[in-house]
Amino acid sequence: IAVDSRKDTDALAKVAEHATRPLTIDLQENYRLAEVVAPWVAKLRYNPGHLYHHERDRPIRDKVAYLAETAATNDCAIRIGVNCGSVDPDKLEQFPADDSISPMLASALEHCELLDDLGFERYCVSLKDSDPNKVIEANQRFAAQRPDVPLHLGVTEAGMPPDGIIKT
């Protein structure tokens, strides 16, 4: 469930009251909503590329520490959700413009290291692109470096049927 505003959190509370299965939320661009929604869900998803949108002067490590502490306090897991369309700007600058996979990989690995350093172990990673071949390559490269981290597989912006169904 995507959550990006207080209105969304109010709706989530109503959905959670009737849910018969654990819920996962996608914090979209507002990571500060984590503490509001965490009591209702089993997993928090954040996008490392979106952590730059709020409190730009606050270090990324502090933002990840807030998410890890919130998740731990509420018995939630975390998904580090790296998306080809919103990669951390600093990572994009480190690689050639025609290499879209390496910045995603660098971002995912950095955030795994941040959570590891914080002692938070209940996390998985997703590396998504609209091109299924890039998704496969990104996940294979990630798994070669971090075989200990579970992967959440999928494409982003899959599209409408039939192409969207085939990609997914």
Regions found by a protein language model. Name each.
Residues 48-119:
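Conserved anion-binding
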Residues 40-56, 154-155:
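Glycine-rich phosphate-binding active-site loops on the catalytic face of alpha/beta enzymes
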Residues 83, 92-168:
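Catalytic alpha/beta core domains of metabolic enzymes, predominantly
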Residues 33, 53-60, 161-164:
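Short, charged, surface-exposed secondary-structure boundary motifs
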Residues 9-16, 34, 64-68, 105-113, ...:
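Generic structural signal for well-ordered alpha-helices
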Residues 18-21, 38-44, 72-73, 142-151:
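Glycine-enriched alpha-helix->loop->beta-strand junction motifs that scaffold or abut catalytic
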